[in-house]
Each structure stands twice: as C-alpha cells, then as structure tokens.
C-alpha cells in the first residue's frame, strides 16, 4: 500500500489477515484505511450465509444469535419486524441483519449509525473467521 506523508510517498504492507476468499476493494479499503462500507458489510453477510448454509435471512439471523462466544446481546441486538406482501411478519433480532436489510431495502423511517456499521462489520468478521476455508 502506498501512502502520502506530506508529499513523500511511502509503501507499507497490510498485515491484517483477509476474511473473504477473494480480494475485494471493500475489504482492502477496510483493512488498509479503516473505511467502513455497505459493500463490505454485504460481502461479509453473504459469505457467512453461503459458508454456513443459512441461506434465508431469518436462518442467518438465528445463526448469529447462537454464536454466544461472539454475540453480545447488549451490542449486537437490534430487533425489528418485516411484513411481506402476503401479510406474513418475520421478526429479526441482530444488528447485522438489521443493517443488511436496510442496505437491501432502504427505508427512510429507519437508519443506522457509522458506529453500528463498524460494530456489525467487526462481529461479521469474527463469525466469518470461524468458518472453514474450503
């Protein structure tokens, strides 16, 4: 990585381990510069779903809660409900799912802070690191 220090260009290595199986600009920006992005959040959430086989949002939400070694209810709980067009209500409980759903289905009545995005990304990183690399 190159950095500009008052007009002097320096190179430095990124020593943080990557989480995702392929290099993405979102992950590189997070590891190198600490840049939070919805892209990285979605990449992590999708990777977690695929690697755990929890392909529905609800099953992934339940999986996240069950990871009690990393899931801290005080930090990571964000309860909300969603009613589908047929009138069925689904209740979700985790911050990562809350943010995932707002990214996927923007809603002007709800939002999240940069602190919540950071907290959610950090949890998703920990959960993804638990997964086998095959």
PLM features: residue spans?
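C-terminal lobe/lid and adjacent interdomain/linker elements of RecA-like ASCE P-loop ATPase modules
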Residues: 1-74
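Charge-enriched, short contiguous segments at helix-coil
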Residues: 80-134
């Amino acid at each position: 990585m190159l950095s500009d220090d008052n007009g002097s260009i320096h190179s430095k290595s990124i020593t943080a381990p990557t989480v995702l199986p392929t290099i993405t600009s979102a992950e590189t920006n997070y590891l190198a510069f600490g840049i939070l992005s919805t892209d990285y959040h979605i990449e992590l959430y999708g990777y977690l779903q695929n690697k755990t086989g929890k392909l529905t949002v609800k099953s992934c939400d339940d999986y996240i809660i069950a990871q009690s070694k990393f899931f801290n209810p005080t930090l990571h709980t964000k309860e909300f409900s969603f009613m589908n067009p047929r009138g069925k209500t689904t209740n979700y409980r985790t911050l990562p799912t809350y943010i995932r759903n707002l990214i996927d289905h923007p809603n002007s009545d709800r939002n999240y802070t940069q602190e919540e995005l950071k907290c959610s990304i950090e949890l998703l990183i920990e959960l993804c690191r638990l997964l086998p690399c095959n």
